[in-house]
Amino acid sequence: LIMEEITIYHNPNCGTSRNVLSMIRHAGIEPTIIEYLQTPPNRETLIELLQSMGISARELLRTNVPEFEAYGLANQAVAEKDIINAMLADPILINRPIVVTRKGVKLCRPSETLLDILPVPLPSPYIKEDGESVNPIEVKGEKDVIDD
């Protein structure tokens, strides 16, 4: 087993979350698994995760759950702190999986996003639940930005 500290905020009922967890294990790493619906992050942790990902609470919101409507979160005027309050009250509003590695923190949707922050390359192609293959060759270090 490769000694790497990786944490995944995981929902076992989510296919993307399961794929990302399997990809981490496929790379030879056993991550710390936080089933965030059972043990949601506290305010400080949630804010830290958002800052590390460089996204707003709105960008982390799940919009396809009844709670999204119930809290009136479709209204763009809802303040960041109020979105965070709703997420803390109802963690189902937090999109997943969030993965923390030494290379960064990301909301890994689609699951291939994991490759951007996975500290080691996949040893071989990983086959997702739907049969789609993720190739280790796609793992890049620093991305070259090419302007069109």
Task: Please give the residue ranges for each predicted region.
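Structural alpha/beta surface segment adjacent to cysteine/selenocysteine redox centers
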Residues: 7-12, 16-80
